[in-house]
Amino acid sequence: MATYYSNDFRAGLKIMLDGEPYAVEASEFVKPGKGQAFARVKLRRLLTGTRVEKTFKSTDSAEGADVVDMNLTYLYNDGEFWHFMNNETFEQLSADAKAIGDNAKWLLDQAECIVTLWNGQPISVTPPNFVELEIVDTDPGLKGDTAGTGGKPATLSTGAVVKVPLFVQIGEVIKVDTRSGEYVSRVK
């Protein structure tokens, strides 16, 4: 892989540090009046998702990570693994609970997901930004109860719990932002 110097770090770049892949989320190059220039970089560890801030001297470098993002279709969960398929080659790939993380509650059959591979193994799964799910349990709302900014918890068909407006009822389908886990709108 290519070698990147600290002044080449940009958001989205994937590099290797301490034998693990990291994604650059933000980078600020600083040239102080006195002393050597440096880069202040915010990184996300791809194996665990934890965020780290590091400082690199202008002469520091890092290897590019051999990480591939693939668009795959979610097929099913067998209890231990989540199975995905490449729509072009029909090749199937299995991801474990560590790679799925908290995203399992947003996975729907036939949903297009971004699966990140490192050394041919899935290390993270990103669901679609928005999903449409049915409400299976929530407190009943009262007619005309639309005032105020309050909400109520609602359990969705995948088991996820989302705060919804008071007028939303059981059986309705809602649109949810998977990045924040927030209610967006009702689906007609």
From Swiss-Prot:
SMART domains referenced in this protein's UniProt entry, alphabetically: EFP, Elong-fact-P_C
Residue ranges of the TM segments: none
InterPro entries attached to this UniProt entry: Elong-fact-P_C (IPR015365), NA-bd_OB-fold (IPR012340), Rib_uL2_dom2 (IPR014722), Transl_elong_fac_P/YeiP (IPR020599), Transl_elong_KOW-like (IPR013185), Transl_elong_P/YeiP_cen (IPR001059), Transl_elong_P/YeiP_CS (IPR013852), Transl_elongation_fac_P (IPR011768)
Main location: cytoplasm
Post-translational modification: Is beta-lysylated on the epsilon-amino group of Lys-34 by the combined action of EpmA and EpmB, and then hydroxylated on the C5 position of the same residue by EpmC. Lysylation is critical for the stimulatory effect of EF-P on peptide-bond formation. The lysylation moiety would extend toward the peptidyltransferase center and stabilize the terminal 3-CCA end of the tRNA. The hydroxylation of the C5 position on Lys-34 would allow additional potential stabilizing hydrogen-bond interactions with the P-tRNA.
PANTHER family: ELONGATION FACTOR P (PTHR30053), ELONGATION FACTOR P (EF-P) FAMILY PROTEIN (PTHR30053:SF12)
Reported function: Involved in peptide bond synthesis. Alleviates ribosome stalling that occurs when 3 or more consecutive Pro residues or the sequence PPG is present in a protein, possibly by augmenting the peptidyl transferase activity of the ribosome. Beta-lysylation at Lys-34 is required for alleviation. The Pro codons and their context do not affect activity; only consecutive Pro residues (not another amino acid) are affected by EF-P.
Similarity-based family: Belongs to the elongation factor P family.
GO biological process, one term: translational elongation
Gene: efp
UniProt note: phenotype after gene disruption: Disruption of this gene leads to lethality or to a very slow growth phenotype. Required for the expression of poly-Pro-containing proteins.
Keywords assigned by UniProt, alphabetized: Cytoplasm, Elongation factor, Hydroxylation, Protein biosynthesis
Effect of residue 33 to K: No lysylation. Loss of in vivo EF-P function for cell growth
Residues recorded as bearing N6-(3,6-diaminohexanoyl)-5-hydroxylysine in the entry: 34
Binding partners and assembly: Binds 30S, 50S and 70S ribosomes, possibly near the A site, note that T.thermophilus structures show binding between the P and E sites (PDB 3HUW and 3HUY). Proportionally less EF-P binds to larger polysomes, suggesting it has a role early in translation. It is present in 1 copy per 10 ribosomes.
GO cellular component annotations of the record: cytoplasm; cytosol
Pfam families reported for this sequence: EFP (PF01132), EFP_N (PF08207), Elong-fact-P_C (PF09285)
UniProt superkingdom: Bacteria
Subcellular location: Cytoplasm
Pathway recorded for this protein: Protein biosynthesis; polypeptide chain elongation
GO MF, one annotated term: translation elongation factor activity
Record's protein name: Elongation factor P
SS bond list: none
